[in-house]
Amino acid sequence: MTPFDTSLVPNGDILIGGEWRRGRGAPYTSIYPADQSLNLEVSTANADDAADAVVAADAAWRRADWAGLKPHQRALVLYRIAELIMQRHEALANLQRRDNGKPIGETRVLVASAANTFRYFAACLETLDEELTPSRGDYLTMSVHEPIGVIAAITPWNSPIASDAQKLAPALAGGNAVVLKPAEVTPLVSLALARICEEAGVPKGVLSVLPGKGSVIGDVLVRHPLVKKVSFTGGTEVGRGIARIAAEKLMPVSLELGGKSPTIVCDDADLDHAVNGVLYGIFSSSGEACIAGSRLFVQRAVYDEFMQRLVAGARKLRVGDPTRPDTQMGPLISAKHRESVERYVALGLEEGGRLLCGGERPSGDGRERGFFYQPTILEGLPNSARICQEEIFGPVLVAMPFDDEASLLAQANDSVFGLAAGIWTRDYKRAWRIARALETGTVWINTYKLFSISTPFSGWKESGMGREKGRLGIREYMQQKSLYWGLNDAPLPWAN
């Protein structure tokens, strides 16, 4: 008997052009990162399957049974998707847990977040206005928005159901057809979500889900002439390659890429509150988050005291069984990824860093069978060190002291990334100055990793382009059109 509900992913079939069937790629064996036990074998797509899905999506988009619906009619389907997600909340949370090893407490939140995302964009459809622009003569002018067409949505393995929802909900709301490419190692919850979408009333062919190798399927999707937009969340180098191909096609892209986010603790901060926030900002999700606060800047006057409290807190974090509600850190996604994290820690030590805690695999309670790694904190490195400049995507924090705002900002902004940042201070004027000067798309003040679906999310610099969430998020999946209505029968000027 399988240790979780597989009713939403029966037989490991995948959705290609409205049909649940076996893909023509090599089967993928999904395992549980906490103990390497078998989840199930999933069919995968190959290049031909990807091309078939795109052609079917284009045909489905051109039909009137989705793009031709009135906005409130599409909204009803999105509301129904949200309802079905919540009806299957616990099954989906456990499926997500088995997929990537996140603790059940986190996956429950992610499932609820996915439902809220569909609900929010349904509400947007009910309330979005078009613009009646000021006239410059005897004519009426207005701006309207139309679907783009076929959207390729490529999502990561760290929070699949939330990432899928953040692309599917606005893309479907906009009247588009979507070919979803989930990460190779986490196909399960994406397939389950597709079944929910069909049950809710998304017409056949409007959504396909193609598990498999990104280098194969992703390449077909990005290059295919019928794909009119790519929305990608993942590594910066892959995103850069997508942008190059898109430039040749003159195709719009949304890219949510890497990060190396600074967290700043000022000398007037509530240190206990800041300790809790810094620990959560880097070690929740085992550090496998693009927004993880992986660079820590602490004002020198409180550096020693703060670091003492922080290290003590890190050592108390509960690392282990993802089924336990009190677990704070689960395993990393794979043995290969854990080895990458270990190489970065070794590099940090070679560069002169001092290990304050962690830096090893935990033992006991069966954790040897999984891909666990202890929360790790280093100090004694300059911001120019590789471990401070390159995204590790794991539970590794590097701490550095700072003396004044000028030196702080010079270091915090000295990064190719610009995704997020956190500030801990009681001084709202200081918070305002620093927040406005930071070169990032999101800044948290006296909190971290909190999100509102109604607030746009974006990266600066090499952390990406485009917007997710908020009303701007739905417009990312629509194209604007201007209409001019003549109001008199006077001849046009050249005919006079």
Which functions belong to the PLM regions below?
Residues 1-35, 60:
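Hydrophobic face of amphipathic alpha-helices that form TPR/SEL1-like repeat modules
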Residues 36-37, 74, 96, 118, ...:
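Residue-level signal for inorganic ion chemistry
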Residues 37-128:
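Glycine-rich loop-to-alpha-helix module at the N-terminal edge of alpha/beta enzyme cores
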Residues 37-40, 227, 264, 318, ...:
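Conserved C-terminal structural/oligomerization subdomain of aldehyde/semialdehyde dehydrogenase
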Residues 39-45, 62-66, 153, 263-266, ...:
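Short, well-ordered beta-strand elements within core beta-sheets of diverse protein domains
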Residues 86, 130-273, 402:
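Rossmann-like NAD(P) dinucleotide-binding subdomain of oxidoreductase/dehydrogenase enzymes
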